[in-house]
C-alpha cells in the first residue's frame, strides 16, 4: 500500500488517515506499506508519541499474523530532525529496533524503499 502526504496536517487528521490506512490494510490483507512524507519538513512530538505508543501496537494486533512492514520515505529535512532532535531520535530508535513486532525502515530514495518492501522485484 502506498500513502503519500502532500502537506502538513493536524494530528486529528493524521490519526484519521492512519485509521483509514489500517482499515484498508485489514480489508485487503496488506502488511507492506510505503509512507511518503517527503513534503514534510517537521513532525510534532505529539505525532511521534502517538504512532509509537498507540498506532504501531494497534496495527500489529490488527494485522496479525501478518507482520507490519513500513518503508517511510523522508525528506532530507525530516531525516535531519530524526537525527538531531534528541526527543525525536528516541522515538525513531525505538521503532527501528529489530526487536519490535513490526519492521520500519527510513529511506530518502523511493526505489530503495520499494526494493526493501518487495525484494523479489529488486
Report the location of each language-model feature:
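Amphipathic, Lys/Arg-enriched alpha-helical "gate/interface" segment within cytosolic domains
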Residues: 1-122
Amino acid at each position: 500500500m502506498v500513502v503519500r502526504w502532500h502537506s502538513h496536517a493536524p494530528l486529528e487528521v493524521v490519526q484519521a488517515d492512519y485509521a483509514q490506512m489500517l482499515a484498508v490494510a485489514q480489508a485487503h490483507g496488506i502488511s507492506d506499506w510505503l509512507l511518503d512524507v517527503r513534503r514534510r519538513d517537521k513532525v510534532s512530538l505529539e505525532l511521534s508519541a502517538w504512532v509509537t505508543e498507540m498506532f504501531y501496537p494497534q496495527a500489529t494486533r490488527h494485522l496479525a499474523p501478518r507482520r507490519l512492514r513500513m518503508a517511510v520515505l523522508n525528506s532530507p529535512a525530516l531525516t535531519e530532525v530524526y537525527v538531531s532532535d534528541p526527543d525525536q531520535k528516541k522515538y525513531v530508535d525505538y521503532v527501528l529496533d529489530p526487536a519490535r513486532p513490526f519492521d520500519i525502515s527510513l529511506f530518502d530514495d523511493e526505489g530503495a524503499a520499494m526494493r526493501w518492501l518487495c525484494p523479489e522485484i529488486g
